[in-house]
């Protein structure tokens, strides 16, 4: 293997969101909100998406603010993993 193929410098997406479900074993559902401007009318809208993330130690709970990172497919719907818990729920 050459040095170029040994070192991959792929940029992985990192998102912050709120944990909306932690009922599954080693999996959390994270609601990620993004503010986008409408292309024609210019109104700023909030778009949200629910992503499933891998939580190896079941650390995150409902209402926690977390940072997740894109990874290889771990299951049929899981392509993200928990990086850190930014703020625990009160």
Swiss-Prot record:
Signal peptide: none annotated. The keyword rRNA-binding applies. It comes from the Bacteria. CDD domains: Ribosomal_uS17. GO terms for biological process: translation. GO terms for cellular component: cytosolic small ribosomal subunit. The keyword ATP-binding does not apply. One of its GO terms (molecular function) is structural constituent of ribosome. Coiled coil: none annotated. Keywords: Ribonucleoprotein, Ribosomal protein, RNA-binding, rRNA-binding. PANTHER family: 40S RIBOSOMAL PROTEIN S11 FAMILY MEMBER (PTHR10744), SMALL RIBOSOMAL SUBUNIT PROTEIN US17M (PTHR10744:SF1). NCBIfam families: PRK05610.1, uS17_bact. Part of the 30S ribosomal subunit. Belongs to the universal ribosomal protein uS17 family. HAMAP family: Ribosomal_uS17_B. One of the primary rRNA binding proteins, it binds specifically to the 5'-end of 16S ribosomal RNA. This is Small ribosomal subunit protein uS17. The gene is rpsQ.
